[in-house]
């Protein structure tokens, strides 16, 4: 039993990202397409940064697989047909800690002085400022802020999942 968290409802999955060769300004915001499960934006250096679906199996490897690349590239070209001739410069895989309901765990842990902030799925990088503020409040006051009060570990054991329509290791897929 590790720190009282031997039953964490989290799985690790690889989420791939890709960068194209630089090009003139094309996209000045982050574009997402829920149905195609794609996000794309343009870096300051001109490369398009895009990604999408998870690899379909649990892994701690920091590399992706070809079928996911093909799926994500096809979604990108569907959204922006002019991308079909761009060269891909690099790709990588990041480990996503996927909770079973698609929502993070931000709460006091099962042991005194232990606090949990995990299971962020796809939203961790984007939600970090607000979540950090709520997490700091939880640690300082030893009680949750109203904004993270529902994001407890015990919700999985009490049948109070937060995103039932997106339950499972693929929260965006129903």
Region spans (language model):
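ATP-dependent carboxylate/phosphate-activation module, predominantly the ATP-grasp catalytic core
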Residues: 14-16, 67-68
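FAD-site-proximal beta/loop scaffold in flavoenzymes
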Residues: 16-22
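A generic alpha-helix surface/boundary motif
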Residues: 12, 70-71, 130
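Flavin (primarily FAD) binding-site architecture
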Residues: 1-5
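Active-site lid/adjacent beta-loop-alpha segment flanking the redox-cofactor pocket in flavoenzymes
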Residues: 6-7, 22-113
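Short hydrophobic/aromatic-enriched beta-strand-loop microsegments
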Residues: 7-14
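C-terminal catalytic lobe of FAD-dependent flavoproteins
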Residues: 34-35, 77-174
């Amino acid at each position: 039993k590790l720190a009282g968290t031997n039953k964490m409802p989290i799985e690790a999955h690889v989420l791939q990202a890709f960068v194209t060769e630089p090009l003139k300004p094309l996209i000045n915001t982050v574009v997402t397409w829920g149905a195609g499960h794609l996000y794309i934006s343009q870096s300051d250096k001109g490369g398009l940064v895009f990604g999408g679906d998870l690899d379909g199996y649990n892994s701690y490897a920091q590399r992706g697989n070809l079928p996911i690349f093909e799926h994500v590239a096809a979604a990108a070209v569907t959204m922006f047909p002019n991308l079909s001739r761009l060269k891909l410069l690099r790709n990588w895989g990041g480990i996503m800690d996927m909770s079973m309901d698609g929502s993070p765990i931000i709460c006091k842990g099962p042991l005194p002085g232990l606090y949990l902030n995990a299971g962020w799925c796809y939203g961790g990088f984007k939600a970090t400022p607000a979540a950090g503020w709520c997490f700091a409040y939880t640690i300082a006051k030893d009680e949750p802020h109203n904004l993270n009060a529902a994001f407890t570990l015990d919700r999985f054991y009490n049948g109070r999942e937060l995103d039932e329509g997106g339950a499972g290791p693929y929260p965006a897929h129903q």
